[in-house]
Structure formats: C-alpha cells, structure tokens
Amino acid sequence: MPFEQISWLQDVREYRRVAKNRKALREPGKGTDYTHERFRDAVNRVVARIHPKRMNLRVKEILPQTAAAKTFCFERVDGPLPPFRAGQYVNVMVTVEGVRTSRPYSISSAPGAQRLELTLRNKPEGFVAPYLFNTLKVGDVLETTGPAGHFYYEPLIDGEDLVFLAGGSGITPFMSMIRDAIQQQLPLKIHLLYGCRMPEDVIFKSELEMLAAHHPGLTFSPVLSEPPDGYEGLKGFLDSTLMERLVGDVKGKTFYLCGPRVMHDFCVAALKELKVPQRKIRQELYGAPEDVSQEPGWPEGLSGDMVFEVEVAEKKMILARAGEPLLNALERGGLKLPALCRSGECSACRIRLLTGKVFVPSQAKVRESDRKAGYIHSCVSYPVGNLKIRM
C-alpha cells in the first residue's frame, strides 16, 4: 500500500479513536491521555486531507483528445489526492497577463484513480483556456482548490434511469460519472446524448464507443449540428423530438445538462415540452453568458462597452464594463476575491453592494438570504451604473 494511503488511514484511525473520548475530554478529571488540542488537531488533519482548501498539482502527462481538446493528467505534490464525487470540479488559479484569476474545470477521471484528470477545450476567444491549452507542459505545477460542486449522482433522488445531455466540453463531468458507474458496476441505465458541431469535435469518441459496445446499460448518441456531406449519423440539435426518439418515455428519468449556456436554454425548453418535472432536471453551468446584453431584462439602450466607476470601501477606485462580470473587473484591478463556480451558485465571491445597481441574469442561482442582506455574487453581477461596494 502506498505511503500516502497508510498515512491517511492512520489519520482516520486517530480520529475514530479520539472521537470516542469527546465526552470525557469535556469533563475535568475524566480525560484520557488525549488533550483537547490533540483531538482538535487530529480532526483538523483528517478534514484537511479529505477537503483541502488548496492543492498543488503537477502535470504528469498530456493526452490529445481532438485538435482543440487535451486531457491534462495531474499528480498532487503536497499530499494525497482527496476523495471526490464523480461530476465535481476544481477551480484552477492562474496569472494571465498580470491578472490573477481562476476558472472551474470538471474532473474527467473517476474517483479513486491514481491521478486527477482535467480535459480542456481551447477557446480562442477565452482568457484562461487558451493560456492553459497553449502553455501548460509536463512538469508544470498549478494551484487549485479542492474538489467542489453539487453536480453528481444522488441514488436516492435520481433513480437508476439517467439521461446525460452534453455539449462541447460539457462532456467532462459525464466521463467521470460514466467511468465511475462502470467501475463500481452500478445498476444504472445511462443515455448519453452529446451535441457537437462536427465529427472532429467529439471528445472521448473512441472510449465512449468502446464503453457503449461492452456495457448494455450505456447508450452513446453523438448529434452533429454541422455534419459533413454524406454523414449518416444523427444530425441537428438536442430538441424534444430527438430526445423522445432516443430515450423513449421520459417518466422516471433524471436529466443532467452540461454545456454552453445557449444549449442549456434550448434543452430546458425542450424538457418542458416533454413535461419533465423541474426536480428531475440537474444543471451544471460554468461562467458568465457570452453576451449578457442579449439576456432577458438587460437595460434597454445600455451598451456592454459602457464603463462605470466602482469604489471599493473608500480605498480604491476601479473601472468596470457593463458587459463583463464585476468579478473580472475586480481581479483586473488587482483585488483578490475567493471564487469557485463563477456562475453564482456557491456564493464564494459575494460582496456587499452599498450604492448603485447591477444586472443579474435570471438563471443565476443567487441565495435569497444574500439578496435580503444586500450581498451580490460578483461573478454574475454586471454594473449598470457607478457602484460602491465592500468586499
């Protein structure tokens, strides 16, 4: 057994042993040889290993997937890899053009693997993805958060008949889920519908075809929106007609969505046509809309290029464009905020809005308690005037 696993088990045994003495530790004169500090330290050590706030990951191997996608295989250099749920992500911290920022990337490897894999698709119009795709090499070390997110299989809630709707690089959490389900021999029926533009855009194509051929519980249906002449596979978009044709009766099925925002809007509308209950639709959204000015409710006549002043707790003034998330402007101004999902769900980047107004897309998952307390999630908040905030 590797040393890291032995050390981990020792920490778990330590925790279980001292946990039995918690009551005695609180009663003077009845304690064991353990002190409160030793108990606390043992618990904290286990928690830090299982749920690390930060990790340093070294690139061990780079696997080409398509012309525009690569899988980066990492080993952890500051401890053992923590456990995670298939479908979770890590947030990668980088400095690009002098700006310290971060982006969440789904883990594509299965839990329990000897290395952690992130599969990235190059987006020329992006900021972080092109930097990682074009500069990251074997031996480089990245700082990331520990695994996070709630986009994973819940057996007691989701049942055993699952439909995965993927688009582009949104295939990555599903690869982790599929690999995990097969390795654990879970009694699941999985329908994977994968929307791409052209045949060369299908990530993991060979592996998915092989897995579907050897596991009757998995069906794999790539759907191309811009197929070449003579293509005999599925064509078009993941609309209600195609879904019903491929998965049959939707009753009792749980639908998972991961892909571009435009795909989410399209697929959610299709699922509503099929009368799929909202509780049976699970979504994973990363990042901000590509063009927030096209979102419902955007102020009429406001250009996304309009620039506003943002005063940060009477200490600093920065400039922010209406068409970019406030978090991006704060990072560009040299301010450090914690961030995870960058889609409004986790609330890690919340700040207090003192004066001014922001636009928040309707699909952003902002907690009602934060709204009432005057907090905004900076990753999904867009200035529509001058602001004053407190971090």
Regions found by a protein language model. Give the residues of each.
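Iron-sulfur (Fe-S) cluster-binding modules
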Residues: 1-51, 273, 278, 300, ...
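FNR/FR-type flavoprotein reductase catalytic core
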Residues: 1-17, 130-312
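Ferredoxin-reductase
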Residues: 42-141, 145, 160-161, 196-198, ...
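A short, compositionally biased
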Residues: 86-88, 301-308, 345-347, 383
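Local cysteine-cluster metal-coordination motifs and their immediate loop/turn environment
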Residues: 173, 331, 335-362, 370-385
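Phosphate-handling active-site elements
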Residues: 182-189, 356-365
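C-terminal accessory/binding modules appended to enzymatic or scaffolding proteins
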Residues: 304-345, 354
